[in-house]
UniProtKB/Swiss-Prot annotation:
PANTHER family: OS10G0509000 PROTEIN, OS10G0509000 PROTEIN-RELATED. Disulfide bonds: none annotated. Homodimer. Binds to stalled ribosomes, contacting rRNA. ATP binds at residues 334-341. It comes from Latilactobacillus sakei subsp. sakei (strain 23K). This is Endonuclease MutS2. It holds the Pfam family Smr. InterPro entries: DNA_mismatch_repair_MutS_C, DNA_mismatch_repair_MutS_core, DNA_mismatch_repair_MutS_sf, MSSS, MutS, MutS2, P-loop_NTPase, Smr_dom. GO terms for biological process: mismatch repair; negative regulation of DNA recombination; rescue of stalled ribosome.
C-alpha cells in the first residue's frame, strides 16, 4: 500500500500507540515494520491472532512476557567465536526462560479448554531448551553477575575469599581499636589498589611499617598497608585473580554451549516478539474499545457507528458508513466545517487498521473490504481562499491517483474541484468521478458544489450524502446522512441571526427556480428522514420494553417452577412421614394378627398380610426430584448480598459485590476496576480460610552494616568537608559489603554534585552511578552501584 496514504491518514500515530504497549525489542520491530496488506487469508490470520490476544487479555490478563532486549548482536558474536559477558548471557537466559514460561502458559490454556484460533500454531514453533536454560539460570544472575553455583571451584574460591577478608578485618581491628588508633585520621579500614589499608596521619607514618598506597587530597592522611597484613593481602589478591580466571572460563563454556542452539534461540526471540505484538494489539483494542471486523472479499464495506480512533472518545461522533454493495460512489455535499474531512479519514484509517490485522473502532459485525490500495487527496486547509497553486497541487495528486487505481481500489477525495472557478470546478469533479466509475473503484468524495447533488441522482451506483447541521443551534452535529444531499442553510442561519425577512425573501427570489426546487427537495428528504428516525427510535424503545418484559416473564416463569418443585418436595416429605407412621402401625397390626393366628388358629393367610403391607409401602414418595435444567439452575443460584465474594464467569475474575444496581445487575469491584455485571454472570464463592503456614524469611546482616547507613547526606556541608566524607563513606560501604548506596548532595550550585561524580568516576570499586528517580530526589541524589 502506498506510503502517502498512510501519512495522510496518520497511520503512524496508531503505530505509536501500539509501541507504547510493546515490552520486547522484537515486538517493537514487528510494530515498526507493520503495514496494511491486501491478501484476505493473511489478513484473517492476523485478525485471528488479535482475537486470541483479546480473549487472553480478557480472561488471563495477557500473555506473560518480560522485558526482553535484542539478542541478535550477541548471537552474531558467538558465530565468530567471541565470548559473551555476563550481561549478554543474562539477556539470552531471559529469552530461554520466557520461552519455557510461554509454552507452559499455553499448555494450561489448552487444559482450561480455551478455544484459540491462531496462536497455538505459532506457539508450536517454539523450541524449548531446558538443559541450557537451567545451566544459564544457575550460573548467571539477572544483572549479569556470575553466581557461586556456576561451578564448584568458583564457590570454593569465594568461600576462601570471604574467610581471608574476615582474617584481614580482624587483624586490622587491632590497629583501629588498639593502642595505635590515636595515630589514625579515622578508626576505619579502607581499600586502595585492591588492598586493605588504614588512614594514617602524615606525621605518624613512621609508627607503621608497610607500604603507602595513596594519600588524601590535602596530603594530611596516608593510606598505608601495614607490614603485618601484606602477606594476607597478597593471598587475597591471588584468590581474586583465580576467581576472575574461573569466571572467564565459565563465560567461555556457556558461550560455547549456546553456539549450536543460536538459530533456535533467535527464532524463539522473534516468536516472543510476535506474541508481544499480539499483546500490544489486544491492549490497543481494549483502550480504543475496538471490535473484530468481518472481512468481505467483495469489498462491501459496512461500518456500524465508526469512530475516528485518534479523536477523544468522549467527543467523537460515530457514523454508519457503507459502500461497495448498493453503491460504489458516495458524494458528500454541504458546507465546510461540518465534518466531511473527518468522515473520509475515519473510513480510510479504519480500513487500513483492519488490513493491518488490528481491531477497528466500530460496533461488532462491521464489515471491511480488502482493497489493493487506498488513495486520497485530502487537504489540511478548507479555506475558500484557495489559489491556483493549491488547485494545481490537488490536480497533480488526482492525476497520479487516476493512473494507479483499479477496480479493487478505494479513493477518498476531499473538496473535489475546489480552488478554481466554481462552474469549471464542478464540471471537473463530475468528469473525475465518471472516470473513477469507469475503472470500477469505490470512491467517497466531498464537495460544496451544488451541481454534484444532481450527479448523485443521475449516475448509477452513486448516492448522495451530507453532514447534518442543526439550524436551531447553528452548529454542525457531525452526523453523516446517507441518501440526503447537503443543502445550504444560509437563509435559515441569516434569519435566526436577525437579518430582516424582507432581505431574505428578496434573496430567495434571486435564486433560479432549479436551485430553489433542489433545496425544497432536500428539505423534504430531510424531513422524511427525521420522521423515519423518530419512528425508528419509537420502535426501538418498544422493542426494548418488550425484551425487558419477556425477560421478566421468563424469570417469573422460572421462579414459578422452582417454587412448585420446592412445595412438591415439602408435600411429599410430609406425606412420606405419614406413610412411615402408617407402616409402623401396620407392622404392629400384622405382628398382632400373626400372633393371633399362631395362638388362636385364625384363618389368615401369610401372603395376604404381606400384600397389605406392600400396598402401604407404595404410598411412599421419593423426595428427590428428577433432574431438570430449571431446578439445576435454581440450585446453583444463591442469594447475593453486599460484601459477597463472587466469580464473574465471563471474565474468569473474582470480585466483591459493592451494591445492587437493579434487580438484574450488581456493581462488582474487581481489583481497581468497578463494573456493572448481570446476575446471571455471577457465582457466589465460598470464603476459604488461608491456613497456609507463614513463610519465615531469614535475613543476614552485612558485616559492617551496623555502623554504616545505606545513605550519605551531604546537604549543608562545605565542599572540602563533603569530599572527605564521601571518601570515608565509600570505603566504609565497601567494607560493609553494600551493593548499592545513595549519596544525597542536593541541587544547589552543583559543585558538590560534580565533585562527587568526579570522585566516583575515578574510583575503581564503583561499577556505575546515576541520578535517583524523580520521586526519590532526581539530580539531587546519586545512586552508586559497586562491583
Amino acid at each position: 500500500m502506498n506510503h502517502k496514504i498512510l501519512k495522510t491518514l496518520e497511520y503512524d500515530k496508531i503505530k505509536q500507540m501500539l509501541q507504547g504497549y510493546a515490552i520486547t525489542a522484537f515486538g517493537q520491530e514487528q510494530i515498526a515494520t507493520l503495514e496494511p496488506i491486501n491478501e484476505a487469508d493473511l489478513i484473517q490470520i492476523r485478525l485471528n491472532q488479535t482475537k486470541d490476544g483479546v480473549d487472553i487479555e480478557r480472561l488471563k490478563g495477557g500473555i506473560p512476557l518480560p522485558q526482553l532486549e535484542n539478542i541478535r548482536p550477541h548471537l552474531k558474536r558467538i558465530e565468530i567465536g567471541a565470548m559473551l559477558n555476563g550481561s549478554e548471557l543474562a539477556q539470552i537466559g531471559r529469552v530461554l526462560r520466557a520461552t519455557s514460561a510461554v509454552v507452559r502458559f499455553f499448555d494450561d490454556l489448552e487444559k482450561d479448554e480455551l478455544e484459540l484460533k491462531a496462536l497455538p500454531e505459532l506457539v508450536a514453533q517454539f523450541v524449548t531448551l531446558p538443559q541450557l536454560t537451567e545451566r544459564i539460570r544457575s550460573s548467571v544472575a539477572d544483572d549479569g553477575a556470575i553466581l557461586d553455583t556456576a561451578s564448584t571451584k568458583l564457590r570454593g574460591l569465594r568461600t576462601g575469599l570471604k574467610q581471608l577478608e574476615g582474617q584481614i578485618r580482624s587483624r586490622m581491628a587491632s590497629y583501629t581499636h588498639g593502642a595505635k588508633a590515636k595515630y589514625l585520621s579515622d578508626p576505619i579500614v579502607t581499600i586502595r589498589n585492591d588492598r586493605y589499608v588504614i588512614p594514617v596521619k602524615q606525621e605518624y607514618r613512621g609508627q607503621f611499617g608497610g607500604v603507602v598506597h595513596d594519600q588524601s587530597a590535602s596530603g594530611q592522611t596516608l593510606f598505608m598497608e601495614p607490614q603485618a597484613i601484606m602477606e594476607l593481602n597478597n593471598r587475597l589478591r591471588q584468590l581474586q585473580i583465580e576467581e576472575q580466571q574461573e569466571i572467564e572460563r565459565i563465560l567461555a563454556e556457556l558461550s560455547e554451549a549456546i553456539m549450536p542452539e543460536r538459530h533456535n534461540i533467535l527464532a524463539n526471540a522473534e516468536l516472543l516478539g510476535q506474541l508481544d505484538f499480539v499483546n500490544a494489539k489486544a491492549q490497543l483494542a481494549k483502550a480504543l474499545k475496538a471490535t473484530e471486523p468481518l472481512i468481505n472479499a467483495e469489498n462491501h464495506v459496512d461500518l456500524k457507528q465508526a469512530r475516528h480512533p485518534l479523536i477523544d472518545a468522549t467527543k467523537v461522533v460515530a457514523n454508519d458508513i457503507a459502500i461497495g454493495a448498493d453503491y460504489q460512489a458516495i458524494v458528500v455535499t454541504g458546507p465546510n466545517t461540518g465534518g466531511k474531512t473527518i468522515t473520509l479519514k475515519t473510513l480510510g484509517l479504519v480500513q487500513v487498521m483492519a488490513q493491518s490485522g488490528l481491531f477497528i473502532t466500530a460496533r461488532e459485525e462491521s464489515q471491511v473490504g480488502v482493497f489493493s490500495d487506498i488513495f486520497a487527496d485530502i487537504g489540511d486547509e478548507q479555506s475558500i481562499e484557495q489559489n491556483l497553486s493549491t488547485f494545481s497541487a490537488h490536480m497533480e495528486n488526482i492525476i497520479q491517483i487516476l493512473k494507479q487505481i483499479d477496480d479493487r481500489s478505494l479513493v477518498l477525495l476531499d473538496e473535489l474541484g475546489a480552488g478554481t472557478d466554481p462552474q469549471e470546478g464542478a464540471a471537473l469533479a463530475i468528469a473525475i468521478l465518471d472516470q473513477i466509475g469507469i475503472v470500477g473503484a469505490n470512491v467517497v468524495a466531498s464537495t460544496h458544489y451544488p451541481e454534484l447533488k444532481i450527479y448523485g441522482y443521475n449516475r448509477p451506483q452513486t448516492i448522495n450524502a451530507s453532514m447534518e447541521f442543526d439550524v436551531a443551534t447553528l452548529q454542525p452535529t457531525y452526523r453523516l446522512l446517507i441518501g440526503v444531499p447537503g443543502r445550504s442553510n444560509a437563509f435559515d442561519i441569516s434569519t435566526r441571526l436577525g437579518l430582516p425577512n424582507s432581505i431574505v425573501d428578496q434573496a430567495k427570489q434571486l435564486m433560479n427556480d432549479e436551485s430553489q426546487d433542489l433545496n425544497n427537495m432536500i428539505t423534504d428528504l430531510e424531513n422524511q428522514r427525521k420522521a423515519a428516525e423518530t419512528e425508528y427510535q419509537a420502535l426501538r424503545h418498544e422493542l426494548t420494553e418488550a425484551t425487558d418484559l419477556h425477560q421478566q416473564l421468563s424469570t417469573a416463569y422460572q421462579q414459578f417452577f422452582e417454587d412448585r418443585e420446592t412445595e412438591m418436595t415439602k408435600a411429599k416429605e410430609k406425606a412420606n412421614a405419614i406413610v412411615e407412621k402408617a407402616e409402623v402401625k401396620a407392622d404392629k397390626v400384622i405382628t398382632k394378627l400373626r400372633d393371633m393366628q399362631m395362638n388362636q388358629g385364625a384363618q389368615i393367610k401369610e401372603n395376604q398380610l404381606i400384600d397389605a403391607k406392600a400396598e402401604l409401602g407404595q404410598l411412599h414418595q421419593e423426595t428427590t426430584l428428577k433432574k431438570n435444567k430449571v431446578l439445576q439452575r435454581a440450585k446453583r443460584r444463591q442469594t447475593l448480598k453486599v460484601g459477597d465474594d463472587v466469580l464473574v464467569t465471563s471474565y474468569g475474575q473474582r470480585g466483591t459485590l459493592i451494591r445492587q444496581v437493579d434487580s438484574k445487575n450488581w456493581e462488582v469491584q474487581m481489583g481497581i476496576i468497578k463494573m456493572k455485571i448481570a446476575n446471571d454472570d455471577l457465582e457466589k464463592q465460598k470464603v476459604v480460610e488461608d491456613n497456609r503456614p507463614q513463610r519465615h524469611v531469614t535475613t543476614v546482616n552485612s558485616g559492617g552494616a551496623r555502623h554504616v547507613k545505606a545513605q550519605l547526606d551531604l546537604r549543608g556541608k562545605r565542599y572540602e568537608e563533603a569530599m572527605a566524607e564521601v571518601d570515608q563513606y565509600i570505603d566504609a560501604a565497601l567494607l560493609a559489603n553494600y551493593q548499592q548506596v545513595t549519596i544525597v548532595h542536593g541541587k544547589g550550585t552543583g559543585a558538590i554534585r560534580q565533585g562527587v561524580q568526579e570522585y566516583l568516576q575515578a574510583n575503581r570499586q564503583v561499577k556505575k552511578y546515576e541520578y535517583a528517580p524523580a520521586n526519590a530526589g532526581g539530580n539531587g541524589a546519586t545512586i552508586v552501584t559497586f562491583k
